[in-house]
Amino acid sequence: MAKSTQKHAILTLLKQASGPLSLRDIASKINHEASSRTLRRWLADWEAGNKVKRSGAGPSTTYQAISNPAEAVPPFSASDSFAFLADLDPDLRRVLLNQIRDLWTHSSTALEGNTLSLGDTHFILEQGLTVSGKPIKDHQEVRGHARAIEVLYQCIDRPLSHDVIFALHRAVQTEYLDDIYKPIGAWKVEANGTHVVGSDNKQSFIEYALPLFVPKLMAEVLDAINATSVDDVTLDNAAVIYAKIHMGIAHIHPFYDGNGRIARLLANIPLLKSGLPPLVIPKEQRRVYIETLSKYQISIGQLTSTSGVWPAPDQLREFEAFCASCYGSTKDLMEEIFKLQRKRAGKGF
């Protein structure tokens, strides 16, 4: 059966089903003509496109077609939500949003080791093609991050919820694993940590929050994001607000993987809601970025339900300064686009 025919058959199956179906149910009904990995990829794409709703986690995950438009995420209009797009012609708005998407996606995935260049990223996202000689994994990461940005944009006009965070995680985690110890779209179930070498050449092991404490700690992060008023975020303090949220999520490390990309996405929510462009950490600053994160986390120690997410806010100053130094690339893109807009206005277009 051709791929397009398979996909159509599965969507029809979900629409006609009397209730939610598990991955095993779907595979059985199509006589296992598509692999579990392929099915997960298609289902994730449909979920991001508001065609399918996912419930549960791990082996108990089920899928159901969205038949009621009220269940779907409403269409997103960037021109209505982002003040940094104001006064731009529609075509220039699209150009700027695509430039930000490409830069944000390239930078965030490159910080995690992705080998695709900015040009490669643009080519993949604009043309939908592959770059010869580059790993499929890298292509999937780029497409997944771009999809996550769309999910974020669609939800920017409502309070952040666990469901949105889990949807973002499913978008960025493009390696589909049937492993109960590596849940996708759910909090981690095993303890995690990382071995680092600081700028002083001293080796350390950072222990992230235990799975037991993740729900309460992430609820604190959610509350902080939702409590941030759009009137409280300005160009002058945007990096400080971004740094606090980013550090909190990175220090909790709530997922088995994908924590950095999720932190960099969620930390931009207050900025975007306030009409500011996202803060993008350049890949060239990767070492300083990791060292600054690690220095704070080693100093604070492992987070618990009693410590809270930010037990010593004063120690965030170095990371705040680092983030402020990174808040330039998207502003530069804006300036170039507005130069074009002013040029058009001067010519009477």
PLM features: what roles do these ranges have?
Residues 1-349:
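FIC/Doc superfamily catalytic core
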